[in-house]
Regions:
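Conserved short submotifs of the Hanks-type protein kinase catalytic core
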Residues: 83-97, 101
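Protein kinase catalytic-loop region centered on the HRD/HxD motif
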Residues: 121-132
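C-terminal lobe helix-coil module of Hanks-type protein kinase domains
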Residues: 143, 174-279
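Protein kinase glycine-rich loop
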Residues: 16-22, 27
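Activation-segment/catalytic-loop signature of the eukaryotic protein kinase fold
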Residues: 79
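AlphaC helix of the eukaryotic protein kinase fold
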Residues: 43-67
């Protein structure tokens, strides 16, 4: 039997059942007896919790994320205050991950994809405005609720992933969405989240990942040196302007990428209001400088 089931944390949170397991933490459904509500509690795995420096950073990052309050971000209610374990108390979501949703639905239609990516970017805009970068945007970290709204999850855990995860097979779920600068080992910024969000949009629109490989390293190398097949070459029903937004978000060169979540939201909203609106963007901007293959240009 799970050692935490039935346990009371801080004389307040009663652990009811395990609802998920990740590479760094285990998630439980729990009841907060002080406020009489159900919550989710993410408990850091014991091997990581034994590292004092990691515990310190975990607590500091969790405290920062707890300050975020936005309808498209999973709320953090509380964090552990020492003791023999480290945990985060979060909003309990009545829904599934975007990964699970995509596995059930396959390729999403472009309107649904637009609906989801706009909400994801709004959540990221809020976090970025407060100096918090997610670093690990992927369908596994996005929750889809029953009403069709989405919430970005795992800010507190993702901020620490760089120090606990290497490009091994275990990292494969994340490396499909990793930005080129992260693959190089450079320090990520808000534009790294934008790249990963572009990959999420690509996967929703096409039902495929832009890059595949037998190992995490081989996928990471493709993010650095390759240009993915344009979404409309996979699914011609995708509006050309939405393809351009997706590919601009995924530009390998930071300077050619959207410079902020708000800038991408502005183009998404303009497209939503008028699908025929012209987006001036040239796919030649996406090509890494060292790649001298012929340029293909899409114009609206």
């Amino acid at each position: 039997m799970d050692q935490y089931i039935g346990k009371m944390l801080d004389n307040r949170y009663e652990i009811l059942e395990r609802i998920g397991t990740g590479g760094m933490a285990i998630v439980y459904k729990a009841k907060c007896h002080r406020l009489n509500r159900l919550v989710a509690i993410k408990i850091l795995k014991s091997d990581l919790a034994q590292n004092e420096e990691f515990r310190r950073r975990f607590n500091a990052e969790s405290q920062a994320v707890a300050q975020l309050s936005h309808p498209n971000i999973v709320s953090v209610y509380d964090v552990s205050r020492g003791g023999d374990m480290e945990y985060i108390v979060m909003e309990l979501i009545d829904g599934i991950t975007l990964k699970q949703y995509m596995e059930k639905r396959g390729q999403l239609n472009w309107r649904e994809s637009l609906h989801f990516i706009t909400q994801i970017m709004r959540g990221l805009s809020h976090a970025h405005s407060r100096g918090i970068i997610h670093r690990d945007i992927k369908p596994q970290n996005i929750m889809v609720l029953r009403d069709g709204s989405v919430k970005v999850a795992d800010f507190g855990i993702a901020c620490l992933a760089d120090s606990a995860q290497t490009l091994t097979q275990e990292a494969l779920g994340s490396v499909h969405y990793i930005s080129p600068e992260q693959a190089r080992g450079d320090r990520p910024d808000a534009r790294s989240d934008i790249y990963s969000s572009g990959v999420v949009l690509y996967a929703m629109l096409t039902g495929r990942l832009p890059f595949e490989g037998e190992s995490a390293v081989s996928v990471a190398i493709q993010h650095l040196s390759s240009i993915p097949l344009a979404p409309r070459e996979i699914n011609p029903d995708i509006p050309e302007q939405l393809e351009l937004i997706c590919m601009k978000a995924m530009a390998p060169d930071l300077e050619h990428r959207y410079q902020s979540a708000d800038a991408m939201i502005a183009d998404l909203e303009a497209f939503r209001k008028n699908p025929e609106v012209e987006m001036k963007f040239d796919l030649s901007d996406l090509r890494p400088e060292e790649n001298d293959e012929p340029t293909r240009t899409i114009r609206t």
